[in-house]
Regions:
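Non-catalytic beta-strand/loop surface segments
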Residues: 1-57, 72-114, 135, 144-200, ...
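Active-site SXXK
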Residues: 61-72
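A common structural junction motif
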Residues: 122-129, 221-230, 341-350
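Carbohydrate-associated surface elements
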Residues: 209
Length: 429
């Protein structure tokens, strides 16, 4: 296979069982570490098993507001002194909420690791959620949602989720709606924190200029005795089938000069054997080069899109396969038809051997680039743990990609992508 020299050159330096240390603390926290002494910095990333999946329907955005409030104050620091501590050593620290997890990310020098870990521990174990800061962030959230309501791309994506995930928790936006944010009180965030934050299922990755034993001992000292016996766990994620016929939803946003659209369907979860064939197929359909076949047809040859590409997203539970475009409002129906035609062709015959070879080379060639920084490695370690992929994932990944055939892509694609059963979401003037 051509263009795999970058992977072959760096294969021996990719993270694996020989240089990843995995350790479980007594309270349920999993620690993953990898040393890299080429620079004096550390990347510290982690997640807790709490997110918007636990939000009540009438208080969507609660997990988002709770995560946003973790750095507003702790039992030891107020908002300003906490940020001063971080900035005084040139470090960074932030928290954010997703559907299934609440994440944190920090970057610092090796000698400042204990300071940053202590601050992470404070924010997770003793946040105070001051009323004035809660009100400020609530207002900021309402402003962000007002901006979202005028964003054609964001609203098309929201509409798309409501079609393919109808009746499913994934149809709900993590940020909620203005009417749900309005109902949330400081007391709600305090209670959500007490109910759902804890060490069970928590994962921390430390990558950089540190020995594994030192990192593990530091985490034992800062988070090893944290417990929440009443920690609420995430519910089982329900399954969902494909929509039975093409369904279109449109949202009018007056005054806009561009329309955004999303066409697509549900996709398998991350651990499905269908994931890799679809990943390579998606690259051919709307990613590789100038955004694959979609980019060539809709943008290059027809000139009808400002941008067009496809995206395959998979996690736990049902995923999504989206074809996304920004177009002149007068071209919406034409572009939807073109995308549908490309989908129909894509499921009618195998991809070419050249397309398959190029796509495989792309995935193998980019892997070392994704893992060249401490941050990239830390993110990857979290993914290995989150999806139970195994510490040897990067050593076995090439075989998985190289084994994919054009016929396998065709048969797998047909299981999900049906040109007569598409979700079509449009937002524009």
């Amino acid at each position: 296979m051509k263009n795999t020299s970058l992977y072959n050159e760096h294969q021996h330096t990719l993270p694996g069982p020989d240089d990843i240390t995995r350790h479980e603390l007594g309270n349920g926290i999993t620690v993953l570490t990898r040393s890299n002494h080429n620079s004096p910095t550390l990347s510290i990333k982690g997640y807790l098993k709490t997110g918007s999946l636990l939000d009540p329907n009438d208080k969507l955005g609660l997990s988002y507001l709770t995560a946003s409030g973790l750095m507003n104050g702790t039992a030891q620091h107020n908002f300003q002194s906490l940020y001063n501590e971080v900035e005084s050593v040139g470090a960074s620290l932030n928290f954010s909420a997703g559907t299934l997890t609440t994440s944190f990310s920090a970057h610092c020098l090796r000698e400042d690791m204990m300071l940053i870990l202590k601050l992470i521990s404070e924010c997770l174990r003793s946040p105070t959620f001051p009323e004035k800061d809660f009100n400020r962030q609530k207002n900021q959230m309402l402003t962000a949602l007002a901006i979202r309501a005028q964003d054609t791309a964001a609203m098309a994506a929201l509409l798309f989720d409501q079609i393919i995930y109808a009746g499913h928790p994934y149809a709900r936006p993590e940020e909620g709606f203005p009417e749900t944010i309005q109902t949330i009180t400081r007391e709600d965030t305090v209670q959500f924190y007490k109910d759902t934050f804890g060490p069970e299922g928590m994962v921390v990755a430390v990558v950089g200029a540190i020995d594994p034993e030192t990192a593990i001992e530091a985490l034992k000292g800062t988070l090893g005795d944290w417990n929440n016996p009443n920690q609420q766990l995430l519910p089982e994620i329900p399954t969902i089938g494909p929509i039975q016929k093409t369904t279109q939803k449109s949202l009018s946003i007056p005054g806009k000069s561009q329309a955004d659209l999303v066409v697509g369907c549900t996709a398998p979860e991350r651990l499905s054997p269908d994931y890799y064939p679809l990943q390579v197929g998606n690259n051919i359909l709307g990613q590789f080069g100038m955004m694959g076949r979609l980019g060539k047809r809709v943008r290059e040859e027809s000139g009808l899109a400002y941008y067009v590409y496809s995206s395959l997203s998979s996690s736990w539970g049902p995923g999504a396969w989206e074809m996304i475009a920004g177009v002149n409002p007068q071209s919406v129906e034409t572009v939807v038809e073109m995308i549908t035609e490309e989908i129909r062709e894509f499921v009618s015959e195998p991809v070419t051997e050249e397309e398959l070879s190029d796509s495989k080379s792309y995935y193998l060639g980019r892997l070392p680039l994704l893992l060249e920084s401490n941050s990239g490695v830390a993110i990857s370690l979290l993914n290995l743990e989150h999806f139970k992929l195994g510490l040897d994932f990067f050593q076995t990944y090439p075989q998985k990609i190289q084994a994919i055939t054009a016929e396998e892509i065709l048969l797998t694609t047909r299981k999900y992508l049906n040109p007569d059963q598409l979700a079509v979401a449009i937002a524009g003037p």
